[in-house]
């Protein structure tokens, strides 16, 4: 059987002579038309350090594909720097870019009849966007992560991007000198790679390795270290073998493999964004997976890894301690993941992990043994109540007591909330409500790292609650609840909260409640009027018009 199963539709036969002429113009030879055409979706960009080191990996992918007998076809995918856009109008485009990237991959693979695709990505939305595009196209595919960043150093301490956000709060509170503030700003990010903790990019890369769509050890390598280039060439070779075997993403991404990925997210203390993105990934794969499935996995999987933002270590430390294979083998030995899931290697999870010890090495404390976890249960809790009947997501690690009842401080945009924090108008015991920031209302469900970082910097991270229908950065920790659904713009109860109302956040009982009578809530609901759309044309207007609820992934192609 030919391995150019799809591309032969545009390269073979008399009628395709004009097509071949165009290929000849790019240096193709006649023999090349029998080889598979394999796309390389290249996310290289000088917009952000997360993506500024990707070109060498795209080049390595091309070399590996061609050495294995394929034709490599490079095309570009865009990126948004979440870190730079944070706290500005630009953050509204971040989640939008996930859909744009997915559309790019699906469109190029479909339009060019590619036989396979290798996606190279770095910044946060590159990850789910690329995976969604691969699943929609459903040709043999592999994800190559651009690698994590190494830590910065100052006064003997490791630094990362979140160090700078938290320094803003410390400096404005008068708890940090200008010299220290400037040095942290200059030293936090020493080179290329994605933000170094178990933030969104590293969470998603780790999950993709567990899912079976990336090679073992691929998710925690540093961008600036040499092994990542050789690893990319190996990924390209493996992809060509998958093309020969016709092993497709939807053969790999199943309900059981998604459960494996979510188990690893819980075990590593990963980002709240993983909930939103895996709902979207499951939708792209045609797999039934709901927000309640995250809670089901959370209750049985412990947090094993001591990783930032709520722990001590960075992704590169996890890599040196055994990486995701060690985390997975520890979970597999405890019966907490499925060993029979097929992976892009053509082998099962159990086969890939056969040479990995059942327990972590004793000479490290990044990965805990199953008998001595960081926490007995996972950290991403799904809260429900009259404020979030469809669900909301709380990250509960690092908190002495993940519950609070206090007066609401209500803000209809992020900027006014941040200004109130900076002006020291927020007190311990308050519950901040940031609303009209959901998929429809934001639009684009922006992340709230600036306010949460400022709260932590002012020493209020555990004593002030913050709820929002927007999202949080993977670098966020504290008494925070995001993805509140239904969102304010859709008439959710969060739109009805008034200044001073009592609100309860309780991660013990998984409750998020507005402590107001049902009669009063009904009265307010009857008086509520939907706000006018903030945008009436362009990409943000399209997103606001078509995005589903956060509780179903905020996707644009859920038409039922």
Swiss-Prot record:
Alphabetic keyword roster: 2Fe-2S, Amino-acid biosynthesis, Branched-chain amino acid biosynthesis, Iron, Iron-sulfur, Lyase, Magnesium, Metal-binding
Cofactor needs: [2Fe-2S] cluster; Mg(2+)
EC numbers for this chain: 4.2.1.9
Pfam families in alphabetical order: ILV_EDD_C, ILVD_EDD_N
Superkingdom, taxonomy of origin: Bacteria
Reaction(s) catalysed by this chain's protein: (2R)-2,3-dihydroxy-3-methylbutanoate = 3-methyl-2-oxobutanoate + H2O; (2R,3R)-2,3-dihydroxy-3-methylpentanoate = (S)-3-methyl-2-oxopentanoate + H2O
Residues holding Mg(2+): 82, 124-125, 447
Disulfide feature: none
Enzyme active site: 473 (proton acceptor)
Binding site for [2Fe-2S] cluster: 50, 123, 195
Cofactor note: Binds 1 [2Fe-2S] cluster per subunit. This cluster acts as a Lewis acid cofactor.
Keyword Lyase attributed: yes
UniProt GO molecular function: 2 iron, 2 sulfur cluster binding; dihydroxy-acid dehydratase activity; magnesium ion binding
Example of a GO biological process term: isoleucine biosynthetic process
UniProt pathway: Amino-acid biosynthesis; L-isoleucine biosynthesis; L-isoleucine from 2-oxobutanoate: step 3/4; Amino-acid biosynthesis; L-valine biosynthesis; L-valine from pyruvate: step 3/4
HAMAP family linked: IlvD
Its job: Functions in the biosynthesis of branched-chain amino acids. Catalyzes the dehydration of (2R,3R)-2,3-dihydroxy-3-methylpentanoate (2,3-dihydroxy-3-methylvalerate) into 2-oxo-3-methylpentanoate (2-oxo-3-methylvalerate) and of (2R)-2,3-dihydroxy-3-methylbutanoate (2,3-dihydroxyisovalerate) into 2-oxo-3-methylbutanoate (2-oxoisovalerate), the penultimate precursor to L-isoleucine and L-valine, respectively.
Assembly and oligomerization: Homodimer.
Full protein name: Dihydroxy-acid dehydratase
Organism encoding this protein: Methylibium petroleiphilum (strain ATCC BAA-1232 / LMG 22953 / PM1)
Source lineage: Bacteria, Pseudomonadati, Pseudomonadota, Betaproteobacteria, Burkholderiales
